[in-house]
A protein has these predicted regions:
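Feature of multi-pass inner-membrane transport and sensor proteins
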Residues: 1-23, 280-298, 324-408, 412, ...
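Membrane transport/envelope proteins' first extracytoplasmic loop
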Residues: 2-268, 277, 421, 425-435, ...
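Hydrophobic alpha-helical transmembrane segments of multi-pass inner-membrane transport and secretion
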Residues: 16-45, 247-287, 307-322, 353-356, ...
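Juxtamembrane segments of multi-pass membrane proteins
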Residues: 62-64, 387-513, 522-524, 528, ...
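Short acidic amphipathic segments
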Residues: 75-90, 293, 452-465, 594, ...
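Glycine/proline-centered hinge or cleavage motifs at structural transition points of membrane proteins
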Residues: 293, 299, 654, 659-660
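Juxtamembrane/transmembrane-helix interface segments of polytopic membrane transporters
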Residues: 314, 318-334, 600, 607, ...
Length: 747
């Protein structure tokens, strides 16, 4: 009998205020949907990447090398390494981008090192879109899947390499070079075509190793370097490959996670206000129930029953929304990495996320309903129940507005930062206009380029650098090899989180991850062996670098001229005002250098990531606008409901509805606009700290937002429009309050 009475009272409560009931369900649904979506996307991404890497048999350690290889030395080394279960040498023919055409699209402006390769014998397979090994026939080529949309490539289209023509037979997923953040891309051809095209490019070798379970790749890398085996190129490990694959879509998932947690916070603030308002509105009923002997526990259970069913309904709706949103947000991910085999794991994560969110809201509602214990029968019936003050209510509105604007700011600021030319300084790339790369062994090209640049009237500033694997020794005698770039680092400096760039011959700087690994910081000493001589250097600074595994060093050398163990040579250039960038690039490309516009390089590397962030940014603006509109309208309506008697008294005294509305709006606007300003400032400060934590793990220490003033102003205007519309709409409820209500009591 009691249960039936409770059920009828619960349904009556829902019908009494359908807007508040719907809003409560909406808050729960949004929280469950976003956190479940984050969990499912993360599960699908990691599952798909792991499945692709396992199917492709990605190497655990890869050494790129240009030059001769002594096979016997390699085999002798492998025999003495019990952790190696398999190894192979793959050939990669690096082609000039100017000689490549896909369909009618030239690859001249590509920022990638493009080349052709054949299928691996024992591992490192390039897979078709069905995750099977494609059969490549003579005259056919398989194109990296990331180029399908980028260059609008269709199966059956022609690919031209110089004067040779191949037919595009399909697309491949290359677990090793799939991400646009990898600087190279492999096209798959048959052995016969590879040999016939050999004279059109520069051949490099991929020396690859697979380890037994539990092997230490860092220990192997040190042993490989100490054995002085071929290492004229960067070394890459399996964790680095996985990180590059994860980073692009992982950035989007990180943004969704931050937004989800903030949406949960907004929902909890709103629910608190809704519950306290409801308790105040139904104080009379609570007093009557207590007066007739109903226990406080039963009254709490009665109230909680209403919200328990709403929580369950909201969770169900939220899971449904996450299922609908998951597919469109996974399209790019599935194209690059395939479908995750852990479908059940994704479902389990979604269910656990829903339980997690539901549990938090369940606990929160129970805590708020303890306020019912403070209501006595006497205070309720005499109308002396304490309610939220007007100031507290308006502070809640300010908080919600601040969080919503903060939500808008994070993806906008992240997008403007990643698309800014300054962001290259976190990647280990100098902040110039042009970057010129010279291949290994081309010291004469570097010298020639240096002479041309010094005499070029279009050049405002330039600097030459060369990178080599350099032996170093710490003060405690520990020896190792560092990937060290030599040159004048006072020109085109990177972002230094501690100290400054090396400016003298006895100074060196370390990347953040290398500094953390070795425990070396500014002021510490390091012995560097250059051209057969030991040089005792002082560490002057720690810089950001997310290239080459994030572990590099910078040595000051006025004029880099080392000839041994040089892995690559580069130059940074800033042009004079009015100089033709395209003309400059064409001139120096003809001199044997690979010349790229740094802005285009960033766009090519981070283009897919930027597109994902831009989509998320638009989605967040829409969601935040809706949150402000819904939440502020709800708050205003509840504030009016809690002040209904006072408003009625004012009307009875002769105040017009228009005057009361104006007064009400004026009292709300200062709090609301304060919330907008706080949200904008927090987006530039707290948002920066949140993104910095994520990028720090990749080697980007000292991350700072590059703010776009137009974007900030637009977000603030958008928030203001939503707030004004919400206050205007919500305050119209004052018109429905009659002057006589104060005489006959609240209806």
């Amino acid at each position: 009998m009691k249960d039936k009475i409770y059920a009828r009272m619960t349904k009556a409560s829902w019908r009494k205020d359908r807007f508040a009931t719907g809003a409560f369900i909406a808050f729960v649904a949004i929280c469950v949907a976003m956190i479940s979506l984050t969990a499912v996307l993360f599960s699908n991404l990691t599952g798909a990447i792991n499945h692709l890497m396992d199917t492709a048999k990605t190497p655990d350690f890869l050494q790129m090398h240009t030059g001769d290889i002594n096979i016997e030395e390699l085999e002798e080394f492998v025999k003495g390494r019990p952790e190696v279960r398999d190894y192979q040498i793959l050939r990669f023919l690096n082609l000039e981008n100017s000689s490549l055409t896909l369909g009618d699209q030239s690859l001249l402006d590509s920022t990638q090192d493009n080349g052709i390769s054949v299928q691996g014998d024992g591992f490192d397979y390039m897979l078709g879109l069905d995750n099977e090994l494609p059969e490549v026939l003579p005259g056919q080529v398989y194109v990296p899947v990331c180029y399908e949309d980028l260059y609008q490539v269709k199966i059956g289209a022609d690919m031209r390499i110089g004067d040779r023509k191949l037919k595009v037979a399909g697309f491949i997923r290359d677990a090793q070079m799939n991400s646009m953040m990898a600087s190279s891309k492999r096209f798959l051809v048959c052995e016969e075509d590879y040999e016939s095209l050999k004279q059109l490019g520069n051949e490099e070798y991929l020396i690859e190793f697979r380890f037994v379970e539990g092997a230490d790749s860092n220990a192997f890398k040190t042993a490989y370097e100490n054995a002085r085996l071929p290492m004229n190129g960067p070394a890459i490990t399996r964790p680095l490959i996985k990180m590059m694959n994860t980073l692009s879509d992982g950035m989007m998932i990180l943004i969704v996670l931050v937004i989800s947690m903030l949406a949960l916070l907004i929902s909890l603030v709103c629910m608190r206000f809704m519950l306290l308002t409801r308790v105040a509105q139904e104080a009379n009923e609570v007093g009557i129930l207590k007066a007739i002997g109903i226990s406080g526990k039963d009254i709490r259970n009665l109230f909680f029953m209403r919200y328990r069913w709403l929580i369950l309904a909201g969770a169900g709706v939220g899971i449904g929304i996450s299922v609908l949103m998951c597919q469109p947000m996974s399209v790019q991910m599935q194209k690059l990495y395939g479908v995750s085999e852990n479908v059940l794991q994704g479902i389990m994560y979604a269910a656990l996320s829903a339980v997690f969110v539901g549990g938090i809201i369940h606990f929160f509602v129970r805590r708020i309903l303890r306020k019912l214990n403070e209501i006595t029968a006497l205070s309720a019936l005499s109308g002396n129940v304490k309610t939220e003050t007007k100031k507290t209510s308006r502070l809640c509105i300010a908080l919600v507005t601040a969080i919503a604007v903060f939500l808008m700011m994070i993806p906008s600021n992240l997008y403007s930062t990643l698309s800014s030319p300054k962001f290259v300084t976190y990647m280990g790339i100098g902040n110039g206009e042009i970057r010129m790369d010279m291949r290994q062994g081309e010291n004469e090209v570097l010298n020639k380029i240096g002479k041309l640049l010094s005499a070029d009237q279009d050049v405002k500033e330039y600097a030459l650098f060369q990178t080599s694997l350099t032996p170093v020794r710490t003060e405690d005698g520990t020896g190792m090899n560092m990937l060290m770039e030599q040159g004048d680092h006072t020109k085109f400096p990177l972002t230094y989180s501690k100290g400054c760039a090396p400016a003298h011959e006895e100074e060196v700087a370390l990347s953040f991850l290398l500094s953390e690994e070795l425990g070396l910081y500014p002021g510490d000493k390091l012995v560097v062996r250059i051209s057969g001589e030991d040089r005792k250097c002082t560490i002057t600074g720690i810089y950001s670098d997310i290239t080459n595994g994030g572990k590099t060093a910078k040595l000051f050398v006025k004029q880099p001229d080392q000839k041994e163990n040089v892995m690559w040579r580069i130059a940074y250039v800033t042009l004079t005002e009015g100089a033709s960038r395209k003309g400059f690039i064409d001139r120096y490309t003809a001199e044997g250098a690979e010349v790229t516009d740094i802005a285009s390089r960033i766009k090519g590397t981070y283009g897919p990531t930027l597109m994902q962030i831009k989509k998320v940014s638009v989605l967040v603006k829409v969601v935040s606008f809706a949150i402000i509109l819904l939440v502020i309208t709800l708050f205003i309506r509840m504030m009016i409901a809690s002040q209904r008697n006072g408003i009625s008294i004012k009307k009875a005294m002769g105040f017009r509805s228009m005057d009361i509305r104006k007064s009400f709006r004026k009292s709300c606007f200062p709090y609301i606009f304060a919330g907008i300003i706080i949200g904008a400032v927090s987006g530039a400060t707290l948002g920066e700290s949140i993104c910095a934590v994520a990028l720090k793990s990749l080697g980007a220490e000292g991350f700072r937002f590059t703010l776009n003033i137009c974007s900030i102003i637009f977000n603030m205007i958008l928030g203001s429009i939503a707030v004004i519309a919400a206050v205007w709409t919500g305050s119209n409820g004052i018109n429905k309050i009659g002057a006589v209500e104060c005489c006959r009591g609240r209806e």
